[in-house]
Curated annotation (Swiss-Prot):
This is Peptidyl-prolyl cis-trans isomerase H. The gene is cyp7. Its main location: nucleus. The lineage of its organism: Eukaryota, Fungi, Fungi incertae sedis, Mucoromycota, Mucoromycotina. It catalyses: [protein]-peptidylproline (omega=180) = [protein]-peptidylproline (omega=0). It holds the Pfam family Pro_isomerase.
Amino acid sequence: MDKKSNQVERPVVFFDISIGDVPVGRMKMELFSDIVPRTAENFRQLCTGEYKRNGVPQGYKNCLFHRVIKDFMVQGGDFIKGDGTGAMCIYGGDRFADENFIEKHTGAGLLSMANSGPNSNGCQFFITCDACDFLDGKHVVFGRLVDGLLTLRKIENVATGPNNRPKLPVKITECGQM
């Protein structure tokens, strides 16, 4: 994987995160545009706000992480409904097909698409907090954390209530491309 990374310029995007009203750090993520170009581009444009509907930028700015499960993953990206039921993508409609399952859920800090079954990718994503190979072949891994593991751990350790929803808002206050 590192060899490919040196041969192809992969985009790097970022999230600035706050918990409650307190800024807790930045996460920088490298997108696997050479392995899953459609999935990576969907995420990239939702980070930058380039994609617009009716002239309004769509994306992750001010979006919440709505599901946090310690030692498993943190999930966000539902800027449509905020509760894990919303979907949207840059390709027209709400969802797009699974691109491939080449990359695996081998450890912490991997970006993967949240879905509701095969070929149901939209805007929701999760970041792994540990290896979770039981997700291989079901969720498309499309990037990795290159900086900000401590910020991920801060999100992972937020107190949660029903449906693993954080008791304090965990918000993407700013996002974009490096």
